[in-house]
């Protein structure tokens, strides 16, 4: 008999051994064997499975749930994604290392007890198509080889504390052609260690029954679409983003740019503490939707803010992080601000070293009313100024020497080229943020880019097809005058060149459908008209 096929004999009147089986009563449509004690596998005790062969020597193993499709590992370093090393040095094992391995499920009688009352005909074969790795060394008289199928692909990245974690798997045999084939739901447990925390079952994988099934036609499972799993994951991530507080406090900021400077809250004056707390209150009540802030309880002088790039700008859908420190003389002087640049200069006011140039900070020229006013200016005003004055639609004109050229043909042309380059740098910033998310924003970064991945890919496809930068709104091309223009040839080529890197990062986040079926290029009126003109010219020349 092949190792991946189990032949189920006709239901005996007398069970194997000397036991006498009592007549069966009517069984419900679904039998849940979780209520059994799994006497053929081990004894459940205190939510753990004790293996009889290992004499009860217990090793506690962390569990995880497949119902939760979100990735919970912390942000990794720039070049350490494959091993999923988090900020605290916890090395998590990639799911792919153990999910492709076969396992042997011993004690055929466990299945026999469940399937006997269902009158499965002799010669019918059941192929169980997916499962996890087993390290069990015990021998068995009969076994089933369970292999991982494509239906596993939709679960995204899962962080585990150990490789050898046994799981509960559901299999369903739905009624189709004959009334005697009721739905049977059972769970197979193969303990890797004496004590194991029981975990939640995934959604049952539907089997399709074939009445003509024989030794050469096993009953096979239809894989669950990864697109459906991704849709469920998207709902969870959208819910996470909705519930994510725009302002909150955290315990520490070990990776903060100003962590090594300043002092603890207890060493500041009462007036300083009172002013900072007033800023906290304003941020908590009045932060706009596109800005989120985290303040440090043990170091009240530290803040971290993230701003979402606005639609219609070369920064759309991106995340831009800023580390902020209140000086000892605050509010007599403005806060110190450092931009997480990743070595990229995406704006005349945002240097690749992290310096932020703004009149409100005293790092840029401006009128008296544009500078920091100790009795009036607030932290909220500073963040909104960065959002509106720096991360704007035409950052080229942020440079004082170029302001006078705004509205001229030459100035607008140069601004267009500059903005196209900024968008490419914004894509690189996305990759940088995904690979190295700032502390306390790890899940936020992952969920944000998971949810926005399709809009970003659609925008890239539109730009490749000739749509002008900034014309994409909610995944579609705006029907505006500027939408009848076209992006430069270099811009289209550069977007096409770097786009795959961005898509690869989205796939690592769990957006599997981008790898299976890339988004089709977006078309706009401009590109369609150009193709029609070319067709007309060809037809005229042929005459």
From Swiss-Prot:
Which residue ranges does UniProt annotate as crossing the membrane? none
Q: Which PROSITE patterns match?
A: UBC_2
Q: Name one GO biological process term.
A: protein ubiquitination
Task: Give the enzyme's EC designation.
Answer: 2.3.2.23
Q: In which pathway does it act?
A: Protein modification; protein ubiquitination
Write down the chemical reaction(s) this protein catalyses: S-ubiquitinyl-[E1 ubiquitin-activating enzyme]-L-cysteine + [E2 ubiquitin-conjugating enzyme]-L-cysteine = [E1 ubiquitin-activating enzyme]-L-cysteine + S-ubiquitinyl-[E2 ubiquitin-conjugating enzyme]-L-cysteine
The protein's matches in InterPro entries, at most eight in alphabetical order, are given as: UBQ-conjugat_E2_core (IPR000608), UBQ-conjugating_enzyme/RWD (IPR016135)
Highest taxon in the source lineage? Eukaryota
Q: One GO molecular-function annotation for this sequence?
A: ubiquitin conjugating enzyme activity
Q: Which UniProt keywords apply?
A: ATP-binding, Nucleotide-binding, Transferase, Ubl conjugation pathway
Instruction: Give positions of region: Disordered.
Output: 1-21, 514-543
| Span of domain UBC core | 271-431
- Which intervals carry biased composition (Basic residues)? 532-543
Entry annotation: catalytic residues: 357 (glycyl thioester intermediate)
Its function, per the record, reads: Accepts the ubiquitin from the E1 complex and catalyzes its covalent attachment to other proteins.
What PANTHER family is this protein classified in? (E3-INDEPENDENT) E2 UBIQUITIN-CONJUGATING ENZYME, UBIQUITIN-CONJUGATING ENZYME E2 26-RELATED
Q: Which family does this protein fall into?
A: Belongs to the ubiquitin-conjugating enzyme family.
Which protein is depicted? Probable ubiquitin-conjugating enzyme E2 26
Which species is this record about?
A: Arabidopsis thaliana
